[in-house]
Amino acid sequence: LSGPAITGDKTSIKLNAQYTGTTAQTVGQRIYIWEGTGRGQYAIVDTFNEVTKVATVKKEFDNTPGWQHLLGGFPIADPLDPSTKYFIEPRGSFSEPTYSSASASLPIAGDYYVGTHGRIGSSNITVLLGNGRGSRTTDGVNFTACSGVSTATWNDIEANANKFISVSSSGVVNSSNDGATWSDISGSVGSDTFTGVAAIGQTWIIVSDTGVIYRSTDNGSSWTNAQVEPYDGSTPIFKFVAAGNGLFITANQYGQTWESVDDGVTWQLAANVGLGVGGPKYIAKDLVFKNGKFLMPVQDSPLDDSTSLNKIFVTNANVAQSSTSAVTVWTESDTLPHSGPYKVTGMQGTFVAITANGETAYSYDGISWKQLTGTLSGTYDKIV
């Protein structure tokens, strides 16, 4: 059944007067907005009043009130209006797969601070790095020791189709073509307090505390740099960087973001026109690009008098959109099942987040989250 809506909001929709379905026929069905305001939103009909034609809706993911979006990261429209066209259709349901975790032994004992995965040739390779140590796996179970890893305080690591690069706060940069054998390429990059690294194709970007951004267009062989933001000698500038959808985004600790739509040649202060993502009540904890989305976990800011729950902000920003708009829209997640703050990763349409204490949660859109059973032992800095 389909038709235009009369009105609606974030938890309900008023169907048109011609809708003749009964409460029994309507409740439990899926409703999908295919055109107009709210396009892409979907939900389960939770209640329906046959007289007023008002249906309340709940999310398929966790049965809480509200809509989800097929492309998670887009804001939910409020209000809906007569341009809103909907389908009501039967809803199939399936049991979610069971979740389990297992420990893996690493060949070199010690703390590991950064990690990433990449597809190099025909192999899926995951690499973990610590101070002077590294471990590599192609199956997540069996790890072998890396060689040549420098003694450094690693801040970030990234992979493209044929290379890994890791950066440190001590100015050391390492690279590897296979994740197993590493070499120091600091001499070709320069010396700085490096905080993040990202890549699109053969173009690599390294960001620093000092406001300098380093760029390579030949897969890390040679580098140029530019002072993108002024540095006062003490206040860190860039803390994170991520890349995807043709877009590079870097951020400072307050969640202010800068975007580049031309492979890192130029940068523009973007999110909220100078305010941090989520506003002054949050500070940023990370920035990643996974499953086609940028995600920024945030923490309640000690600089703001209010107390805010730790969240994750999500955007589907891409190079075409950012080329025509100076403001990137970030959508605030629902409340996560633990106090956080979180680090987050994603693969094959699923996001997984972890706290420092090993509490885990998962999501299919980065907005709605459920708790995974049990708490992992240990202390966690990153999830890959």
Task: Locate each region found by the language model.
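Entry beta-strands of beta-propeller and related beta-repeat scaffolds
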Residues: 122-128, 162-166, 203-206, 246-250, ...
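Surface loop/turn motifs at the tips and blade-to-blade linkers of beta-strand repeat domains
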Residues: 104-108, 147-150, 186-190, 228-232, ...
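Conserved Ser/Thr-centered positions that define the repeating blades of beta-propeller domains
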Residues: 136-137, 175-176, 216-217, 260-261, ...
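Short glycine/acidic-enriched loop and turn motifs that connect beta-strands
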Residues: 134, 172-173, 212-213, 255-256, ...
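Repeated scaffold domains used in trafficking and secretory/extracellular systems
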Residues: 109-119, 152-160, 192-200, 234-244, ...
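Autoprocessing Asn-cyclization modules and mimics
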Residues: 1-77, 81-82, 87-94
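Beta-strand initiation motifs
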Residues: 94-101, 141-144, 180-183, 220-224, ...
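An edge-strand/N-cap motif at the start of beta-rich repeat modules
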Residues: 93-140
